[in-house]
């Protein structure tokens, strides 16, 4: 169908997480690499997801502001899974109650996906323009194994799509070595969670690196 429209090319990509990341898409589609600290525009690219593209179209062509958002409600323990068009600002509780309420065996609700999502502490929190999914997890799915010591296997570095060394960033973060964290490009972390997923020692690498990244960015902008 894209052949009907000038300037549109549909390009199939491998099903590889996190291929949908901004810099990963540029590399896969244009074979260009955005340098550390750089922006897509530096290599002649602008990346927008489908929701943003639709919002721009609605604003320009229909004079419609961004007042609603598509939200997927899902999870193995959630019986009434659905895709809903929700007004921005709607309390999360309203969405969940509309679909029958929180299941008894749900232990945690995640805003976002299983890899990059964040736990919801308050169901009265509002739906934001970036709220794409509500994921319900059981106790078994949220169970964390005891944290061990880093064995320097390098699996986290092999899995990192940004070419970082999470095992090193973890060590620097635990010692509060902010300058070294910046020198090792902690600010380039896209928080995909691949390091956490692959770590055989069950070290909470994503949580540690996310906090360290925030501290470094505050200093840079400072």
Which residues are covered by each model-predicted region?
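Short, flexible active-site loops
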Residues: 74-81, 138-141, 153
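Ferredoxin-type iron-sulfur electron-transfer modules in oxidoreductases and energy-metabolism complexes
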Residues: 131-147, 157, 161-222
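Structured core elements
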Residues: 72, 83-85, 94, 110, ...
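Conserved active-site and cofactor/substrate-binding residues in soluble primary-metabolism enzymes
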Residues: 47-55, 68, 79, 87-90, ...
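Active-site gating/interface segments in enzymes
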Residues: 18-19, 25-33, 100-151
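Hydrophobic alpha-helical positions that pack around
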Residues: 1-92, 98-103
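Flexible, glycine/charged-enriched surface loops at secondary-structure junctions
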Residues: 7-10, 68-70, 103-112, 179-183, ...
């Amino acid at each position: 169908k894209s052949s009907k429209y000038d300037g549109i090319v549909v390009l199939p990509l491998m099903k590889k997480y996190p291929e949908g990341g901004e810099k990963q898409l540029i590399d896969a589609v244009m074979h260009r690499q955005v340098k550390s600290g750089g922006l897509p525009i530096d290599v002649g690219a602008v990346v927008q997801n489908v929701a943003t593209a639709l919002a721009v179209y609605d604003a320009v062509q229909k004079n419609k502001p961004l007042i609603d958002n598509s939200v997927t409600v899902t999870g193995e323990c959630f019986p009434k899974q659905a895709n809903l068009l929700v007004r921005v600002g709607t309390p999360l509780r309203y969405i969940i109650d509309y679909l029958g309420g929180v299941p008894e065996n749900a232990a945690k609700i995640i805003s976002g996906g299983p890899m990059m999502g964040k736990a919801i502490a308050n169901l009265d929190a509002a739906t934001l323009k970036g709220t794409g999914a509500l994921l319900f997890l059981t106790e078994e799915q949220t169970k964390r194994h005891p944290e061990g010591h880093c064995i320097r296997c390098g699996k986290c570095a092999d899995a990192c799509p940004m070419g970082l060394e999470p095992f090193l960033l973890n060590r620097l973060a635990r010692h509060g070595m902010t300058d070294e964290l910046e020198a090792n490009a902690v600010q380039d972390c896209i928080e995909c969670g691949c390091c956490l997923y692959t770590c055989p020692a069950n070290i909470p690498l994503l949580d540690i690196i996310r906090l360290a990244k925030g501290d470094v960015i505050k200093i840079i902008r400072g």
